[in-house]
Amino acid sequence: MKDMKDTARRRPLPDAEADGVIEGRNAVIEALRVGTAIDKIYIAKGETDKTLGHIASRARDAGIVVVEADRRKLDGISRTHAHQGVIALAAVREYVTVESILSAAAERGEPPLLVVCDEISDPHNLGAILRTAECAGAHGVIIPKRRSAGLTAVVAKTSAGAVSYIPVARVANIPSLLKDLKKQGAVSYTHLTLPTT
């Protein structure tokens, strides 16, 4: 019986899951149970179902962003049109911690070069940033948990493979992270793009 479970775990994901979209109550519960890296979970607005409540609670406990969305939004994201009121967006690779990025730089005897992004919501832009950061020799990229694109299939494709090489960490609060890094002696350079009117 154990061999069958191991084989089942290694089966290729259906196309919908391979691109990071996990649909349906049981599929999302199982993804949470095995520790799949999930960027965000959408739950149908106004649903009071016990199972959806369990999913939301478990996701929040794991630090995953839970968003209530109307059914039209869920239908728009859905690949199977059988989402049962819940869709998880899984990352194409695991996130790391900021500490692990800093440790890797220290092990190499190099001052850490980090690219910190805030509110990069377009996955194509994040993919391009990952590609550029990897080419520039950055030790890692840091993004916020909210108001940012995650490590989706679109980001992976746009990064031209860089997502497989550059570590990416997610943090709850970018300003707090920058203060902590400054206390550790980090120097920061900032680029702001202001909207044109």
Regions found by a protein language model. Name each.
Residues 24, 121-128, 173:
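Amphipathic alpha-helical repeat scaffolds
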Residues 189-196:
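Conserved small/polar residues in nucleotide/adenosyl-binding loops
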Residues 139-189:
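Histidine/lysine/aspartate-rich catalytic loop segments that bind and position anionic ligands
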Residues 20, 44, 118-119, 144, ...:
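Glycine- and other small-residue-rich loops at beta-strand/loop junctions that grip anionic moieties
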Residues 93-95, 99-109, 121, 130, ...:
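Basic, flexible Lys/Arg- and Gly-enriched helix-loop patches that mediate nucleic-acid binding at interfaces
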Residues 1-104:
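N-terminal positively charged helical leader segments and presequences
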